[in-house]
Amino acid sequence: MLGWNKHVFFSESRINFRCLLRKKLKKRCPLSARFVLVLLLIVLIFILKMGYKQLIYKLNHPPLRRIDERNDPLFSNGCKNVHLEAQLHPRMNATFVMLARNSDLPGVVSSINSLEKHFNRHFNYPYTFLNDEPFDEKFKETILKLTSANVEFGTLEKDTFGFPGNVDVDAAREAIASQGDRGIMYGDTESYHHMCRFFSGFFYKHPLLLKYQWYWRVEPDVAFTCDISYDPFYYMEENGKIYGYVVALKELEDTVPNLFRYTSAYRRNNNLTSNMWKFFLDAPKKENYDISRKDPTVGLSFSSHLNAMIDSSYSAETSSMEGESYNMCHFWSNFEIANFKFFRNEQYENFFRTMDATGGFWTERWGDAPFHSLAAGLFLSKEQVHYFRDLGYRHSDIHHCGQSLGCNCECIPELSEIESTSGGCVTQWVNLIGDGFLDE
């Protein structure tokens, strides 16, 4: 008869048989072995879960498009032998640089753990931490436990992180407050203006950094999502690169309404030519402008003319200059690897002093990222700039993942690939360095 017969199941002979079977299984499978089996099962589930996440990422994110890399080839496609790389090539004169406060410690720990895991445990480059206030002992002790690399902690001088002596502070603060009223991102945060000015014209002169030739900028609360199995400093040196980036995107237009006009005027007045400049150009517009003329939006002694500055910031003409219009593209400077010689020269210093004198770091919300980028357009060739397309990086909700180009990439399924968004600038880059996308 089909079905379950409780009398048969609970018969004495069946019960004795099951008891005997359990005894034999216990002898054959002791407690330690069962623990190992459970552990292996947990590991298998974890591996399957991670594989599932990457499968979901690939289904929701198309692979990176093939590009013409003749002028900027990858330093690595896939994984190199990281142990061999670390032994073969000499360490460059380089350091990581992070500007942070004591309150940033959790985000700093997260960033350093990610960087050590994916790169620096093999290459052991030193860290330089900077702060506008002294670091406390808790901060320093925590950081020293995260890495075997050398670590230095420095404090910024007041004249490099604050209002300079020739600035009308009340007018500057009024201009900063007005940016908050207009909803400009970080526009009403005074320390943000100080930070952008510091990274535009002073960080490379800090006493702790003067001994270095190269730097890699790191910020709190970022993540590296691919293993970096080679030394970026070494390969940049070997390939004649000066500046490297991993994210290129468009700036918020209301943060830099006059930066491009002033930079373009500086370029023309100093007869500067570079094939890098085209990266920043949009459709042409005709406008005549003299950077030396008196302008109510220039300088900081014009408190009574604040309304004129506000109107100018929203003018459709402010991003144009003699037929050249700024496309808002820039390299995100929270991840940049560069040679200090890009900054440590009279050419760059003169450019910074000229731009600083306009007051744009206060009357507008100039970021160091577009400032560095436009300076690269003035002083570097496209052959001296490198796109680390094989690396993976996440800052806030902006994400680039090397996918099949990188090494052991763990892309973040919840975030869009910056190359695939309208705010990215990969199209401008590939058109600059070659013949565009190869799948067109």
Swiss-Prot record:
GO BP term, example: cell wall mannoprotein biosynthetic process
Residues in compartment: Cytoplasmic: 1-35
Keyword DNA repair appears in the UniProt entry: no
Record key words, sorted: Cytoplasm, Glycosyltransferase, Golgi apparatus, Membrane, Nucleus, Signal-anchor, Transferase, Transmembrane, Transmembrane helix
Membrane topology, as annotated: Single-pass type II membrane protein
PANTHER family: ALPHA-1,2 MANNOSYLTRANSFERASE KTR1, O-GLYCOSIDE ALPHA-1,2-MANNOSYLTRANSFERASE HOMOLOG 4
Function (record text): Probable mannosyltransferase involved in O-glycosylation of cell wall and secreted proteins. Transfers an alpha-D-mannosyl residue from GDP-mannose into lipid-linked oligosaccharide, forming an alpha-(1->2)-D-mannosyl-D-mannose linkage.
Similarity comment: Belongs to the glycosyltransferase 15 family.
Designated name of the protein: O-glycoside alpha-1,2-mannosyltransferase homolog 4
Annotated organism of origin: Schizosaccharomyces pombe (strain 972 / ATCC 24843) (Fission yeast)
Chain's gene name: omh4
